[in-house]
Design a protein with these regions (language model features):
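Short coil/turn linking the two alpha-helices of tandem helical-hairpin repeats
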Residues: 146-148, 153, 203, 253-262
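Membrane-proximal, proline-rich intrinsically disordered regions
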Residues: 18-64, 98, 114, 297, ...
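Surface-exposed intrinsically disordered loops and tails
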Residues: 204-232, 285-302, 397, 404-417
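Polar, glycine-rich mid-to-C-terminal structural blocks
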Residues: 249, 255, 277-370, 376
Length: 452
């Protein structure tokens, strides 16, 4: 998930004499004293760290058994086929991750020196909030580093990544040994504990003084002060429920067989995931159409002010004119490039509607009619031969159009008909809005979208 947090850029021009006109200052670099005197400068450091959070798209599936692509030079395809190198590593996060962690370490060390507000109560609340944000972001960046760069050494040890929690100056020794995988997990969990202790689960305005959460009552008993710092204007910043979600991911990573996970680790991961699900009222608290959050037009069009449907914990800002996903992944007959092609392996993983896997004799699976009676998510997430999609003809009128992917289909949607055709007989449908028209001669405009 890269979040579109607005980058703070502040410029101050001071003309104090003729000499200043001919002696330019260092290009917009602020010294520590200037940062300490302005909460805007200090928050700018933190907001820039949000901007480094990796974007979440589905291209990584090309390196798995779930999808291939018709882009022959795709870096994830190179990973899958063994044609990648250290210099051409699409999952490399080393430099970005450590640069950002070092900024966060400096930010944490300097928090108490910054004037966060003129009045004491909001200043203390701001200090508490940004401290929680910084610890949470550091945990997130260490998670990405661990996920992308941990592994088993030649002598069989499971190693993580180097750990440092203090600011390192440019002349420091950066040649640090790797910590063990378990040490890294403990550090991430510790940072998440710190974040949850300081942050509200969600940033929402409260209606009365009595609604202030207990952990903030030692700072303020006034709702207007609480709302100023912890209210709705802080939506989309790191919060307590995001910390719980990252904890779930970290513990799931630790439970994975790829990292020598054991049965106890699976139990820990399940408990962490349950805490996130319980936050929205359990499985029954989710909307019935939540599986298609990406094309539920009513909900998407209603998004505003950082509000999310229950299926979404964290997302980018909405994009009001973006059809890049549709252009890249629609079938050729819909003027798309058909880039992501689900594999038969993924299609076979969808069970029958009765819950049985298709390999089970009780499933009722019919190889002569392979898509009938399947889990309804199959038709929502994947275009298969004969499946229908609701396409717009460019005038605002929608039609159900069958996608024919067989090699003898007689359309450009068939297997390997052209460069933009599927390689597997399937096209990705998940993440795509069905009311976008990619016909270059169409007058239909791109529509609202967002990434989670």
């Amino acid at each position: 998930m890269k979040k579109n947090i607005i980058m703070l850029v502040t410029g101050i021009v001071m003309l104090s004499g003729c000499d200043d006109l001919f002696s330019p200052a260092i290009d917009n670099f602020k010294d520590q004293e200037q940062v300490n005197s302005s909460s805007e400068y200090a928050q700018g450091m933190l907001l820039n760290c949000y901007r480094i959070i990796p974007g979440y798209y589905s291209d990584t599936d090309y390196a798995t058994d779930d999808a291939v692509t018709n882009q022959k030079g795709n870096p994830y395809l190179n990973m899958a086929t063994g044609n990648w190198t250290a210099a051409d590593n699409p999952v490399n996060f080393w430099n970005q991750g450590y640069n950002t962690i070092n900024v966060l370490n400096r930010f944490i060390a300097n928090i108490d020196n910054v004037k966060w507000a003129d009045d004491e109560e909001p200043a203390r609340l701001f200090r508490m909030r940004v401290t929680g944000e910084a610890y949470g972001l550091r945990a997130l960046f260490y998670y990405y580093l661990l996920r992308n760069h941990a592994g088993i050494t030649d002598d069989g040890q499971l190693m993580g990544v180097p750990l440092f929690t203090t600011f390192l100056s440019s002349d420091a020794n950066f040649n640090m040994p790797r910590a063990t995988f378990s040490e890294c997990v403990r550090q991430i969990i510790s940072d998440l504990d710190s974040a949850e202790a300081k942050l509200p689960e969600e940033y929402e305005n409260i209606n009365s003084d009595s609604d202030i959460p207990a952990k903030y009552l030692g700072i303020t008993k006034r709702k207007e002060v609480y709302n100023r710092v912890m209210g709705q204007y802080a939506r989309q910043l790191f919060n307590g429920i995001i910390a719980k979600a990252i904890r779930s991911r970290v513990t799931l990573l630790a439970a994975s067989p790829a990292f020598k996970g054991d049965q106890q680790a699976w139990g820990t991961a399940a408990d962490a995931a349950a805490a996130v699900i319980d936050h929205v009222g359990g499985v029954d608290g989710l909307a019935a159409n939540g599986v298609t959050y990406y094309c539920n037009t009513t909900e998407i069009d209603a998004l505003k002010e950082g509000v999310n449907p229950k299926e979404i914990l964290w997302r980018e800002n909405i994009q009001t004119a973006d059809d890049s996903q549709e252009q890249n992944n629609y079938p050729p007959s819909w003027f798309g490039k058909g880039m992501m092609n689900p594999t038969q392996n993924l299609v076979d993983a969808f069970p029958m509607a009765n819950g049985y896997p298709i390999s089970n004799p009780k499933s009722g699976y019919n190889a002569e009619d392979p898509y009938s009676g399947r889990d309804p998510r199959l038709s929502k997430y994947i275009f298969y031969n004969g499946s229908k999609g609701t396409a717009d003809d460019g005038t605002g009128t929608s039609h159900d159009i069958a996608i024919l992917t067989g090699s003898l289909s007689g359309t450009d949607d068939g297997i390997n008909v052209k460069e933009t055709s599927t390689r597997t007989g399937y096209y990705m449908k998940k993440h795509l809005r069905m009311d976008v028209n990619c016909n270059p001669s169409s007058n239909m405009k791109s529509l609202i979208t967002y990434h989670v």
